[in-house]
């Protein structure tokens, strides 16, 4: 189950959020074995983000927490697509979109724990 949270320093309308959600649901399929069916998303707008000593340009910091993909398959294509998505929907310049990937070794959901070692 991926959990992707984005933080941007600009406002995000409901329509923009819904568009990002829909596109992210398709884009996660670039990572093998992942789909919108198990995708958890979070959107935080109007964050206080600074880049190169300046906060006047739109910036996106995105955390992609992904379970069971320690080989990082699909991350190049995912990065390219997410970067363009935030540019097209929110007008954030591609050079101001940053994505941090975190491997999730254990994930608890629905009262159960999932350990990636069980899936090898």
Task: Say what each PLM segment does.
Residues 1-120:
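Interaction-mediating elements
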């Amino acid at each position: 189950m991926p959990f992707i949270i984005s933080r941007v320093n600009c406002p995000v309308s409901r329509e923009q959020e819904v568009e990002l959600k829909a596109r992210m649901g398709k884009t996660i399929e670039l990572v093998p074995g992942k789909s919108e069916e198990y995708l958890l998303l979070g959107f935080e707008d109007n964050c206080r983000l600074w880049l190169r000593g300046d906060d006047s340009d739109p910036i996106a910091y995105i955390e992609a927490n992904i379970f069971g993909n320690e080989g990082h398959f699909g991350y190049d294509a995912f990065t390219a697509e997410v970067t363009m998505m935030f540019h097209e929907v929110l007008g954030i310049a591609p050079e101001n979109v940053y994505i941090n990937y975190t491997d999730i070794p254990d994930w608890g959901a629905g009262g159960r724990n999932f350990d990636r070692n069980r899936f090898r």
